[in-house]
C-alpha cells in the first residue's frame, strides 16, 4: 500500500524524523487558512501517488496566503499521470543549502534489504544513477541487525557525506530504519533529504510503501487506505476477499492459482493479436476454492466492468475437483440470473475433469462454451470479445 506524502510525513514525525510543519487541505479556502496559520513562505503540494508532480505543475511556492489560494485553485482537479488531485498539503517553506537522497527498500532479487544513499542526490537522483552510478551508494542491510548508529555512519561515509555532516544525518538514517522495520514497509524513501541554511537536516519529501500482508499486525494501517481513490471494482473484489487487479482489456479472466492466471493473461494477449488486439481485462485468482459463492462473486465483479465483452474461466482441478468447479459455475450463473449477460468460455482440466465437463454440457447454459485446451479457449474468448 502506497502512502500519500502527508501520511508518510506524519509517520516520519511519529518516529522522530525531522520534518517541516504541514497541513492537509481539500479546498482553496482551506489552503488559504493553512497558509495564514503557518505564516511566511509555503509550498502547496499535490497529494497523488505518482511521481513527476513538480514538472506537471503540482508543486507551487507561495509567498502569501492569497498566493497559496491561487496556487491551490490551479492544482486541485489537476490530472497528473492519470491521478486527479483532490487534496493538497501546505508545507512550511525552507531555505535549502543542499539536497541528498536516502531510501531503504526490499531487494527481491537478492532477497534482502537494500539501502541507497547519495550525498550528491536529491530530486535528480534518477539522472545521477544513470550518468554517475558511483555517486549512489548501495549498502545491503542485514534484516536482523538493521541500521544502528554504527551502520548509519557507515552508510553516510559510503555515500560520501563529509565528516561534519555524518553526526547530523546518521541519526536520521537510523530513525528511518525504525519506520521501515516497525511499520513492515517495503519502501521508505526521502527525496530530497535536505540541509537547510540554518544547518538542520529535514526530510522534505517522503514515500512509504507498506506491506499489505502485514496489515493484521498494525491496527492503524487500515485507516491509511484511500477508499475514494481505489478502483471501485477492486474495492468490490476486496470485500469478497478476491485477488483482483483491473487491467484495460476486454476479456475477463477467472482462474485458480496466480501462476495459472498469469499464464492465462499471456495466452489471451497472444490470441487477441489475431482478433483485433483484444487484451485481458483483469487478473482474478479465486484460489483453491471454486464454490458457487466464490464464482458468483468473481463473475459479479468481472461483469460489472463495462469494458468486458467475454469471460474466460480457466481452472485446473487439484484439491478442488473439476465437478465442484462446474457446479460452482452453474450455481453462480443461476445466482446472478439476468445480471449474467456476457459469454463465458470455460476450460477445465485435472481432477475429475470428465465429470466437470459433463455437468456443464448437460446444463447447456446459452452463455457457456466448454473448450478442451487453454489455447483453444483463449482463441474463442478473444473471438467473442472482438465480435
From Swiss-Prot:
GO MF term list: ATP binding; magnesium ion binding; succinate-CoA ligase (ADP-forming) activity; succinate-CoA ligase (GDP-forming) activity
ATP-grasp domain: residues covered: 9-236
Alphabetical list of Pfam families matching this protein: ATP-grasp_2, Ligase_CoA
Superkingdom, taxonomy of origin: Bacteria
InterPro entries (alphabetical): ATP-grasp (IPR011761), ATP-grasp_succ-CoA_synth-type (IPR013650), ATP_grasp_subdomain_1 (IPR013815), Succ-CoA_synthase_bsu_CS (IPR017866), SUCC_ACL_C (IPR005811), Succ_CoA_ligase-like_bsu (IPR005809), Succinyl-CoA_synth-like (IPR016102)
Pathway annotation: Carbohydrate metabolism; tricarboxylic acid cycle; succinate from succinyl-CoA (ligase route): step 1/1
Reaction(s) the record says it catalyses: succinate + ATP + CoA = succinyl-CoA + ADP + phosphate; GTP + succinate + CoA = succinyl-CoA + GDP + phosphate
Keywords, alphabetical: ATP-binding, Ligase, Magnesium, Metal-binding, Nucleotide-binding, Tricarboxylic acid cycle
Matching Gene3D superfamilies: ATP-grasp fold, A domain, ATP-grasp fold, B domain, Succinyl-CoA synthetase domains
Chain positions recorded as ATP binding sites: 45, 52-54, 94, 99
Record: residues binding Mg(2+): 191, 205
Cellular component terms (Gene Ontology): cytosol; succinate-CoA ligase complex
Chain positions recorded as substrate binding sites: 256, 318-320
Assembly mode: Heterotetramer of two alpha and two beta subunits.
Protein name: Succinate--CoA ligase [ADP-forming] subunit beta
Organism: Clavibacter michiganensis subsp. michiganensis (strain NCPPB 382)
Lineage, opening ranks: Bacteria, Bacillati, Actinomycetota, Actinomycetes, Micrococcales
Encoding gene, per UniProt annotation: sucC
Amino acid at each position: 500500500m502506497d502512502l500519500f506524502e502527508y501520511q508518510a510525513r506524519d509517520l516520519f514525525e511519529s518516529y522522530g524524523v525531522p520534518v517541516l510543519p504541514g497541513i492537509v487541505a481539500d479546498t482553496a479556502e482551506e489552503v488559504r487558512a493553512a497558509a495564514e496559520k503557518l505564516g511566511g513562505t509555503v509550498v502547496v503540494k499535490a497529494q497523488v501517488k505518482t511521481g513527476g508532480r513538480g514538472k506537471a505543475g503540482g508543486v507551487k511556492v507561495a509567498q502569501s496566503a492569497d498566493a497559496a489560494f491561487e496556487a491551490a485553485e490551479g492544482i486541485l482537479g489537476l490530472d497528473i499521470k492519470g491521478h486527479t488531485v483532490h487534496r493538497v498539503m501546505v508545507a512550511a517553506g525552507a531555505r535549502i543549502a543542499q539536497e541528498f537522497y536516502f531510501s531503504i527498500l526490499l531487494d527481491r532479487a537478492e532477497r534482502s534489504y537494500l539501502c541507497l544513499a547519495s550525498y550528491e542526490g536529491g530530486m535528480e537522483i534518477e539522472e545521477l544513477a544513470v550518468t554517475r552510478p558511483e555517486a549512489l551508494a548501495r549498502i545491503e542491510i542485514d534484516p536482523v541487525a538493521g541500521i544502528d548508529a554504527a551502520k548509519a555512519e557507515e552508510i553516510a561515509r559510503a555515500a560520501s557525506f563529509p565528516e561534519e555532516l555524518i553526526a547530523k544525518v546518521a541519526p536520521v538514517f537510523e530513525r528511518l530504519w525504525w519506520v521501515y522495520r516497525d511499520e513492515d514497509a517495503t519502501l521508505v524513501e526521502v527525496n530530497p533529504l535536505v540541509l537547510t541554511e540554518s544547518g538542520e537536516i529535514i526530510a522534505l519529501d517522503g514515500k512509504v510503501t507498506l506491506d499489505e500482508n502485514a496489515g493484521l499486525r498494525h491496527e492503524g494501517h487500515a485507516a491509511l487506505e484511500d477508499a475514494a481513490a481505489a478502483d471501485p471494482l477492486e474495492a468490490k473484489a476486496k470485500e469478497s476477499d478476491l485477488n483482483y487487479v483491473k487491467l484495460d482489456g476486454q476479456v475477463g479472466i477467472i482462474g485458480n492459482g496466480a501462476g495459472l492466471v498469469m499464464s492465462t493473461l499471456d495466452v489471451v494477449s497472444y490470441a487477441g493479436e489475431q482478433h483485433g488486439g483484444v487484451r485481458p481485462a483483469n487478473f482474478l485468482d479465486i484460489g483453491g476454492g471454486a464454490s458457487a459463492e466464490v464464482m458468483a462473486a468473481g463473475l459479479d465483479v468481472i461483469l460489472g466492468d463495462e469494458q468486458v465483452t467475454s469471460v474466460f474461466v480457466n481452472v485446473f482441478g487439484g484439491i478442488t475437483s473439476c465437478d465442484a468447479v462446474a457446479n460452482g459455475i452453474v450455481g453462480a450463473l443461476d445466482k446472478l440470473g439476468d445480471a449474467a449477460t456476457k459469454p463465458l468460455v470455460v476450460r477445465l482440466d485435472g481432477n475429475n475433469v470428465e465429470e466437470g465437463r459433463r455437468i456443464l454440457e448437460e446444463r447447456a447454459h446459452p452463455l457457456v462454451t466448454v473448450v478442451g485446451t487453454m489455447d483453444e479457449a483463449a482463441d474463442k474468448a478473444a473471438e467473442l470479445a472482438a465480435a
